[in-house]
């Protein structure tokens, strides 16, 4: 952890990863990273069913070859019940540190369990679907409700571009949507700072905005199965995570567009991916801000991410329900949604932006 000072000169903790390793084949460097961090025994690898063979067992074998005691456990859902199950397993096995190996959900479960036990955590993503792979936040579901929970940032991030490039491209495109959503998140944060004197960090906001803009400007170069695309997106996700750590909150990367996504999770029969929904939410919220929503839509189209309800696989009526509900998701967080949209206003926004037809 690093110590910094806020605008009033008060101390606050800033958590940042010590090591970030990105590249082809870097999963084979996991034991070197652990050795560098003085993590030398009693590791718990938390992975998923599908990612166990892709990366989980590679990490386990690598650490065991280095003489470490390593256990591997399969995480089946991103719920508090699952976090508690993993936590109990870790206590019983004397775990000294965690490695979350897999998707964002698996990483969030490992991150929270490690935070609860106050032990180090290393993030080893097999997909780049959202900024949870590096942030100090975790998204946990309770039924149809998704909650963003404060956690410790990973001590290290090991992102193997070859593995991530082989994941379904839809996941990478979703990660782009999550990054581009910084555009409206920062606008919401600025608005809250002006109207409600919410603490605002110019550094965090600038980093989050720049990260999103670089991705928008490079949208036509992000393609399936290209490691160069993966490197760009992973670096952007890392930057977003760092922006949140600097801010001490998720404000630089989570605003009204994320509230819309969480509202969709509640009302839709089959929600889309988090980053996909945030991307569409960014189009809608940029319209409300009076910004260039078409630029957002065009960038998402170039990347191959959804820009309409149909492309999300969600009925128009759920888009409208989510828009009306969005302001209630985090009522303490002021955004462009204010006290909420009327059903008529929601329909105008959705039709003007062509999110619904």
UniProtKB/Swiss-Prot annotation:
EC category name: oxidoreductase
Positions contributing to NAD(+) binding: 104-108, 126-129, 135
Cofactor section: Zn(2+)
Binding site for Zn(2+): 178, 258, 274
Catalysed reactions, as listed in the record: sn-glycerol 1-phosphate + NAD(+) = dihydroxyacetone phosphate + NADH + H(+); sn-glycerol 1-phosphate + NADP(+) = dihydroxyacetone phosphate + NADPH + H(+)
Record GO terms (molecular function): glycerol-1-phosphate dehydrogenase (NAD+) activity; glycerol-1-phosphate dehydrogenase (NADP+) activity; metal ion binding
Note on cofactor: Binds 1 zinc ion per subunit.
Any GO CC annotation of this UniProt entry: cytoplasm
EC number: 1.1.1.261
Job description of the protein: Catalyzes the NAD(P)H-dependent reduction of dihydroxyacetonephosphate (DHAP or glycerone phosphate) to glycerol 1-phosphate (G1P). The G1P thus generated is used as the glycerophosphate backbone of phospholipids in the cellular membranes of Archaea.
The protein's name: Glycerol-1-phosphate dehydrogenase [NAD(P)+]
């Amino acid at each position: 952890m690093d110590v910094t000072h806020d605008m009033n000169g008060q101390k606050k903790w800033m958590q940042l990863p010590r090591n970030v390793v990105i590249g082809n084949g870097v999963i084979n460097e996991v034991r070197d990273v652990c050795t560098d961090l003085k993590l030398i025994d009693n590791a718990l690898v938390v992975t998923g069913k599908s990612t166990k063979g892709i990366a989980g067992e590679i990490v386990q074998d690598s650490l065991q070859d280095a003489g470490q005691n390593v256990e591997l456990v399969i995480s089946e859902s991103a719920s508090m019940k699952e976090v508690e199950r993993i936590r109990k397993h870790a206590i019983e096995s004397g775990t000294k540190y965690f490695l979350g190996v897999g998707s964002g959900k698996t990483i969030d479960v490992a991150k929270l369990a490690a935070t609860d036990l106050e032990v180090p955590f290393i993030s080893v993503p097999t997909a780049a679907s959202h900024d949870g792979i590096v942030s100090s936040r975790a998204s946990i579901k309770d039924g149809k409700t998704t909650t963003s929970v404060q956690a410790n940032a990973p001590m290290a991030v090991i992102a193997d571009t070859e593995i991530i490039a082989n994941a379904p491209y839809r996941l990478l495109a979703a990660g782009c949507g999550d990054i581009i959503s910084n555009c409206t998140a920062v606008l919401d944060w600025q608005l809250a700072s002006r109207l409600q004197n919410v603490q605002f960090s110019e550094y965090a906001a600038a980093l989050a905005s720049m990260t999103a803009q670089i991705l928008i400007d490079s949208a036509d170069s992000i393609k399936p199965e290209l490691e160069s695309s993966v490197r760009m997106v992973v670096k952007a996700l890392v930057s977003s995570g760092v922006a949140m750590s600097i801010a001490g909150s998720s404000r630089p990367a989570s605003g009204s567009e994320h509230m819309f996504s969480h509202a969709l999770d509640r009302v839709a029969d089959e929600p889309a991916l988090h980053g996909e929904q945030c991307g569409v939410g960014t189009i809608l919220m940029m319209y409300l801000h009076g910004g260039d929503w078409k630029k957002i839509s065009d960038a998402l189209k170039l990347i191959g991410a959804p820009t309409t309800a149909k492309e999300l696989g969600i009925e128009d009526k759920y888009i409208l329900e989510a828009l009306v509900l969005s302001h209630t998701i985090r009522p303490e967080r002021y955004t462009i949604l204010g006290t909420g949209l009327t059903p008529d206003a929601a329909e105008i926004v959705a039709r003007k932006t062509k999110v619904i037809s």
